[in-house]
Amino acid sequence: FYQPDMTSRVAASMRLESRLRQALDAEQFVLHYQPKVDAASGVTVGFEALLRWQDPEVGLVPPGEFIPLLEESGMIVEVGLWVIHRALEDERHLRALGLRPGRIAVNVSARQL
């Protein structure tokens, strides 16, 4: 059954998908690294790479607002590859500085497997 708000929801979803494409092209996605700590020793043993969208118009967009649309649109595969490459580049950079970040965990979509 058609409801009047369906048109506006579809239009909003399409606008967001277009903005996500622009965000990828304009390098607005960033990774934040959350430490993984050994509970017994308190030692940081690695990091988890977390995808964030730094939108120049609205600031930091919560992942719950854009990751589901990346999944639905299929863009998650392209963005997921970007995440993997970025995490590897960041890890190489840290090692070049003489740091040892440990393991970096990257969450991937089932579509990427």
Where do the protein language model's features map onto the residues?
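Bacterial c-di-GMP phosphodiesterase EAL domain
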Residues: 4-113
